[in-house]
Amino acid sequence: MAIEEKLESLTSRHAELSAHLADPTTVSDSKRFAAYSKEFSDLEPVVAAWQAHLAILQQLAETDEMLAEAGDDAEMRQMAREERETLKNKLEQSQKHLHLMLLPKDPNDDKNVILEIRAGTGGEEAALFVSDLFRMYGRFAEIKGWRIEMLSSSATDLGGYKELIAMVQGKGAYMGLKYESGVHRVQRIPVTETGGRIHTSAVTVAILPEADEVELHIEDKDLRIDVYRSSGPGGQSVNTTDSAVRITHLPTGLVVICQDEKSQHKNKAKAMKVLQARLLDAQQQAADSQRAEARKGQVGSGDRSERIRTYNFPQSRVTDHRINLTLHKLDQVLQGGLAEVVDALTAHDQASKLAHLGGGD
């Protein structure tokens, strides 16, 4: 079986690394020693789980042998059958655990996140829902122990946002938010509606892993940086100094604007973070498109134009269309209670990846 062969191969590699780490020539080479140590550490839990799995198989074989030798001893046979049932359950759990450990890890999972929320169809109502979603993610971040900071925003007169960009910092931020990319649809009676009719609006969410400098090098010659006075809702000037920053990446035409800070330097630093994340995301999207076939069964396509979720206020309903999950607890979700949705999406994604793994893909 392909999975067993993979586990045996990893066990052999673990033993090799153990020998390398005991070799004085490796110890004297700090770079190689660090690389081997990390690989050894990553393999340690997998190998330990595989050894435990083999031990259960051995116990099961011994129990079968005991059952065969029990003869007419009813008490012995009953005891062996009970032990066998317990071991079979343990084996099943062990197998699931091993399969999950073998799933390729997303290298972005522990990264910070650039969160971008933009109003789509629906005008002012869509802009207000941008504000609602930002509040939801802020409370979810608080529950998870993450820090959220607004980097840039474009406010409207009624308190909504045409666009909002924020940084979410904390362990597992990308892992917890990566399934949020896509179109979020809201159905409710807008505050501006006098006839009591339900309107449908849409908001687009993009979740980008923060780019490390080592992953992405941007040449100064590829940037055009413009500074100007920041403006508020309606276009009125809110600052008397040239603190707003617009950075254009000339090779791609990507433009990032930051004006929320009073300091030009802070706005520039924030704009660079957003630009780096967008460029890294563009690289990864291009790479992902080459692996599109392998991603078909996974949760959503990650396509920003994909409608992923509907928030229906009259029915207090949240529906995630990718996994056909419906919850009648809209208020709880908007208060940051996203865990149930995220857990269901994660489980679905893992199940589809396990199906590929089991098929030897």
Curated annotation (Swiss-Prot):
InterPro entries xrefs: PCRF, Pep_chain_release_fac_I, Pep_chain_release_fac_I_sf, Prokaryotic/Mito_RF, RF-1
PTM (free text): Methylated by PrmC. Methylation increases the termination efficiency of RF1.
PROSITE patterns recorded: RF_PROK_I (PS00745)
Keyword terms, alphabetized: Cytoplasm, Methylation, Protein biosynthesis
Molecular function in Gene Ontology: translation release factor activity, codon specific
Cross-referenced NCBIfam families: prfA, PRK00591.1
Localization per Swiss-Prot or TrEMBL: Cytoplasm
Lineage of origin: Bacteria, Pseudomonadati, Pseudomonadota, Alphaproteobacteria, Magnetococcales
Pfam families per UniProt: PCRF (PF03462), RF-1 (PF00472)
Any coiled-coil regions, as ranges: none
Keyword presence, Protein biosynthesis: yes
Family: Belongs to the prokaryotic/mitochondrial release factor family.
Function: Peptide chain release factor 1 directs the termination of translation in response to the peptide chain termination codons UAG and UAA.
SUPFAM superfamilies: Release factor
Modification N5-methylglutamine occurs at: Q236
Domain of life: Bacteria
Record carries keyword Plastid: no
Region (Disordered): 286-306
Full protein name: Peptide chain release factor 1
GO cellular component: cytoplasm
